[in-house]
């Protein structure tokens, strides 16, 4: 449990602690183990809220459990788990410190495209509050585009005068005459991001005749979907090529290293399938909402002529086109996942068959050893220094040897026959087969008797 105290009160305690520490050193006391709360007497004026609970708490903790406050850290641990070390406590305090206290987290880096497709600001830094007030957004809307948050869930949000998009490597804010492309960490120098920015600037130009009469926001949307589908298609081809090569190699030889490689690629393919499925679902969800489809026409809304709720045929056709592309990618990857699962099942069957073959061979050796043990048992009986009354017999040796050999052969043949019967795997048991055979014989007899009586 942690209690958050006010900033002014914590800084005041810190200054007083700093002033008293030299006096404590002269007295030979340890300042690290002395709680800073004990340096102050209860205030003369009444306290309220958390400060009152802090000064007049009925449970007092030992000095070793109260840490020395540091600037920027105002979370004081009151209790901790058993066996908690000071290092773990410090890490917990640092992780619980809100990142909004840091000044650099109040800035957002983004590139701005104007109505002609030209870059007016390249990787500029803007304050969050400035973006929220200027574009009429809420803090929760900006969090969807926060470059510091590694979110795998894609989003397409339609607001009154803007469209928020978070798809793969693209996080953008589209307006009727402007596009803000937020910088994503680790993708500023990537080839995909560079190609997308070039294609976006080209499609936003008014002189571009290939886009037809689409409004500004539709051209930006199409450029974003083209980049997203191209990235998904390229990644799908890589996964397909690698996994098909592994599956073809497994058909020739089943190796542990190949199976391990298949496991790694299967995990990557599952993650890619989830990513593509989420993108397809977010487009499908947008297609099912007529209000959002009509709200995508930002240019007409800015001119004071918003579209009716059921008047969105152009943007619906645009979204359906890329929905089909994304669904095709999902189906292709799903078939590849099914091939991997089928291959895994076949490999397991082959390994089980090999294991059964080894067990069968081991049983044969054991049966042979059992037969030899039966023959040597007779030999051991005649090896004792006792009279057996056939010492002087001419046929004694041959008779004993023959009996031992016949016993050995009989044991081996009997158990091998039993092993072959166990190996037969049928859908019906032997009892059902015998009953079916008896029923067939009885039916034949009844038919024969019926024919004889009719004559």
UniProtKB/Swiss-Prot annotation:
* Gene Ontology terms for molecular function: magnesium ion transmembrane transporter activity
Instruction: Tell me which Gene Ontology terms the entry assigns under biological process.
Output: mitochondrial magnesium ion transmembrane transport
InterPro entries named among the record's database cross-references: MRS2-like
Short motif (YGMN): ranges? 382-385
Q: Where are the transmembrane segments?
A: 365-385, 396-416
Q: What cystine pairs are annotated?
A: none
The region called Disordered is annotated at 433-455
Q: Where is the composition biased (Basic and acidic residues)?
A: 433-444
Where is the transit peptide, renumbered to this chain? 1-56
The main place the protein resides is mitochondrion
The UniProt record lists the keyword Oxidoreductase: no
Q: Name one Pfam family in it.
A: MRS2-like
Q: Provide the Gene Ontology terms for cellular component.
A: mitochondrial inner membrane
Superkingdom per UniProt: Eukaryota
Keywords carried by this UniProt record: Ion transport, Magnesium, Membrane, Mitochondrion, Mitochondrion inner membrane, Transit peptide, Transmembrane, Transmembrane helix, Transport
- Which locations, inside or outside the cell, does it occupy? Mitochondrion inner membrane
Q: How does it sit in the membrane?
A: Multi-pass membrane protein
Describe the function of this protein. Mitochondrial inner membrane magnesium transporter required for mitochondrial magnesium homeostasis. Modulates the conductance of the MRS2 channel. Involved in the splicing of mRNA group II introns in mitochondria by affecting mitochondrial magnesium concentrations, which are critical for group II intron splicing.
Q: How does it assemble?
A: Forms homooligomers. Interacts with MRS2.
Into which family does the record put it?
Answer: Belongs to the CorA metal ion transporter (MIT) (TC 1.A.35) family.
Extract the PANTHER family matched here: MAGNESIUM TRANSPORTER MRS2 HOMOLOG, MITOCHONDRIAL (PTHR13890:SF0), RNA SPLICING PROTEIN MRS2, MITOCHONDRIAL (PTHR13890)
Q: What is this protein called?
A: Mitochondrial inner membrane magnesium transporter LPE10
Q: To which species is this protein native?
A: Yarrowia lipolytica (strain CLIB 122 / E 150)
Underlying gene: LPE10
């Amino acid at each position: 449990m942690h209690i958050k105290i006010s900033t002014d009160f914590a800084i005041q305690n810190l200054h007083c602690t700093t002033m008293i520490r030299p006096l404590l050193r002269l007295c030979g006391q340890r300042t690290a183990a002395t709680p800073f709360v004990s340096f102050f007497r209860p205030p003369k004026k009444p306290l309220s809220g958390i400060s009152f609970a802090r000064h007049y708490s009925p449970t007092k903790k030992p000095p070793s459990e109260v840490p020395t406050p540091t600037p920027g850290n105002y979370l004081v641990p009151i209790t901790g788990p058993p066996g908690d070390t000071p290092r773990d406590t410090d890490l917990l305090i640092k992780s619980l410190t809100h990142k909004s206290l840091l000044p650099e987290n109040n800035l957002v880096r983004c590139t701005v495209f104007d109505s002609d497709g030209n870059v007016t600001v390249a990787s500029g830094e803007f304050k969050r509050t400035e973006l929220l007030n200027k574009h009429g957004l809420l803090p929760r809307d900006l969090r969807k585009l926060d470059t510091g948050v590694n979110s795998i869930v894609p989003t397409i949000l339609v607001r009154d005068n803007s469209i928020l998009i978070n798809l793969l490597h693209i996080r953008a804010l589209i307006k009727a005459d402007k596009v803000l492309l937020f910088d994503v960490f680790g993708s500023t120098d990537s080839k995909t991001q560079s190609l997308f920015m070039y294609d976006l600037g080209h499609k936003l130009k008014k002189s571009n005749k290939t886009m037809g009469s689409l409004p500004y926001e539709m051209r930006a949307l199409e450029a974003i979907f083209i980049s997203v589908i191209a990235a998904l298609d390229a990644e799908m081809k890589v996964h397909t090529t690698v996994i098909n090569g592994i599956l073809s190699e497994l058909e020739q030889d089943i190796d542990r290293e190949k199976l391990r490689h298949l496991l790694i690629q299967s995990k990557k393919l599952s993650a890619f399938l989830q990513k593509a499925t989420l993108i397809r679902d977010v487009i499908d969800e947008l297609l099912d909402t007529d209000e959002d489809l009509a709200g995508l026409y930002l240019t007409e809304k800015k001119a004071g002529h918003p579209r009716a709720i059921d008047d969105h045929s152009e943007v619906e056709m645009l979204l359906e086109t890329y929905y089909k592309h994304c669904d095709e990618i999902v189906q292709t990857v799903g078939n590849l996942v099914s091939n991997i699962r089928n291959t895994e099942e076949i490999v397991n069957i082959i390994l089980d068959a090999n294991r059964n073959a080894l067990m069968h061979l081991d049983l044969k050796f054991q049966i042979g050893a059992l037969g030899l043990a039966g023959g040597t048992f007779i030999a051991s009986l005649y090896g004792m220094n006792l009279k057996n009354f056939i010492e002087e017999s001419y046929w004694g040796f041959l008779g004993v040897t023959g009996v031992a050999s016949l016993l050995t052969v009989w044991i081996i043949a009997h158990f091998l026959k039993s092993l072959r019967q166990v190996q037969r795997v049928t859908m019906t048991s032997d009892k059902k087969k015998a009953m079916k055979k008896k029923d067939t014989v009885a039916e034949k007899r009844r038919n024969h008797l019926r024919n004889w009586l009719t004559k």
